Amino acid sequence: MTKKKIGLLVMAYGTPRTKEEIEPYYTHIRHGRKPSQELLDDLTERYEAIGGVSPLAKITDDQAIALEQKLNELYDDIEFKSYLGLKHIDPFIEDAVEQMKEDGVQEAVSIVLAPHFSTFSVKSYNGRAHEESKKIGGPRIQSVESWYDEPLFIQYWVDQVNDTMAKIEDKDKACVIFSAHSLPEKIVDYGDPYPQQLKETADLIAKGAGITNYAVGWQSEGNTPEPWLGPDVQDLTRDLYETHGYTSMIYCPVGFVADHLEVLYDNDYECKVVTDELGIDYYRPEMPNAKPEFIDCLATVIQKKLAEKE
């Protein structure tokens, strides 16, 4: 039996793989404007603080390969081939779509490695993929828009919260902070579902883990003058401590799916500076990365998308 071929377009933000790639990467994020030496030095220092470069590039590769393998195990009649498309560094999203076309792929399914939909992220990734496909005449792409409430995703974080709580003696004095990457506040005016989806994710995990001490915050906001979604996780940490006297903070950056700069620096360094200053305990559960239970989650999301009537 001839297997049907489907392209698996896995999209993500991207990260520099070497120190030399930091400047072009940052320039692309800034829409072609080169960063000042001061900004470049600041970003480079952050990377150096987590070991030189982010482990994200390898993790994203591992996630795409593992997802391809899992889907090929699940389907007897379909052969999946994964293509990585990145937002700010090669291989760009457009490169991946072109490669699928070159490989003779006529049908594809796409997923962004970010659970919550926003006009800034998922809509823009999917838009770029569809635009390129239209421009070059294929392949036809079915796109996943969000998976923030996928039961296997929620269960991953429920297990992480439970495992972390098991290490804490005074559980009544522990608080979980659920967070995602902040975006400009103006998205709320456009009716963007991003903030509400993060809240729903937090509520579902809290319910599953049976916790009532939790809050939602935002992190890693951009370096621009416009207002960004808040409260920032560092400010939130101080407020929660002052209001409730918590002695343990558990940071769950559920808007992210891997160890990278925003987690390894913004959480593990910047938030820990705050908890150390307050004299309280810092906990940050393991990120999904390419763990089998997370790959199962992504595969389930893809299965559901393919089962939809077009």
Curated annotation (Swiss-Prot):
Fe-coproporphyrin III binds at residues 13, 30, 46-47, 54, 125. InterPro entries: Ferrochelatase, Ferrochelatase_AS, Ferrochelatase_C, Ferrochelatase_N. Involved in coproporphyrin-dependent heme b biosynthesis. Catalyzes the insertion of ferrous iron into coproporphyrin III to form Fe-coproporphyrin III. PROSITE patterns: FERROCHELATASE. Keywords: Cytoplasm, Heme biosynthesis, Iron, Lyase, Metal-binding, Porphyrin biosynthesis. Fe(2+) binds at residues 181, 262. The keyword Cell membrane does not apply. GO terms for molecular function: ferrochelatase activity; metal ion binding. Pathway: Porphyrin-containing compound metabolism; protoheme biosynthesis. Coiled coil: none annotated. It comes from the Bacteria. This is Coproporphyrin III ferrochelatase. Signal peptide: none annotated. One of its GO terms (cellular component) is cytoplasm. Disulfide bonds: none annotated. The keyword Transcription regulation does not apply. Belongs to the ferrochelatase family. Pfam families: Ferrochelatase. Its EC number is 4.99.1.9. It is found in: Cytoplasm. GO terms for biological process: heme biosynthetic process. It catalyses: Fe-coproporphyrin III + 2 H(+) = coproporphyrin III + Fe(2+).
